[in-house]
Amino acid sequence: MITVISPEELVQNETEIINQLFQEGLDLLHIRKPFINQNEMTDFIQKIDSEFHSQLVLHSHYNLADNFNILRFHFREIDRKNGLSQSFTDKTISTSVHDIETFNELNEEWEYAFISPVFPSISKKGYGENSNILNDIKKRDNSNVELIALGGINENNIHHVFDNNVDGVALLGAIWESNQPLNVFKKCKQNINY
């Protein structure tokens, strides 16, 4: 599975790029826009082809889901700990963790979890420089939750990530820091046995 996470800030031609990514086989798009209001989020989602709405995952503005046939929700680590996800257990929910021990403790209510940073971040300079997560994934003993690697993954290292017992990857900086995001996505797909 290849997931793309939106940048926090709006990017020029972002929804056009998103539609093209879906047309090229993107599995899921996580919409993480913490700084936009309800109307801006509505406009953003409306610009994504409705045939792809079931592949969208909301990180906020959960109340918009019914308007757009969105059944997937992501909860930050702090929100998971505070029980925010409890009213969404009949939906598809995901979360984030930052170590394999926490991942191994997740129960089956979570479809998948991002684990990060796998490599030094592309979008957050200096973050993840000394990460051992890719090595720590070998200690995975939770088969109830899919493990999605995040952080510094690009077309040059994606194959190495898939060689390490992950169920998928999430791309952020590799896509949105590139002048040719669609080409990067295509190369990522080509560089794994997908």
Residue spans for each PLM region:
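A short acidic, helix-capping loop that chelates divalent metal ions and anchors anionic groups
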Residues: F119-K125
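Flexible, gly/ser-rich surface segments that form the specificity/activation loops bordering the active-site cleft
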Residues: S116
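Conserved N-terminal beta1-alpha1 strand-loop-helix module at the mouth
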Residues: M1-K81, Q86-Y112, D141-L147, I153-N165, ...
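Generic low-polarity alpha-helical segments
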Residues: A113, D136-I137
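The catalytic core of metal-dependent phosphodiesterases that act on cyclic dinucleotides
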Residues: L172
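Charged helix-capping and loop-helix junction motifs
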Residues: D43-Q46, Y127-D136
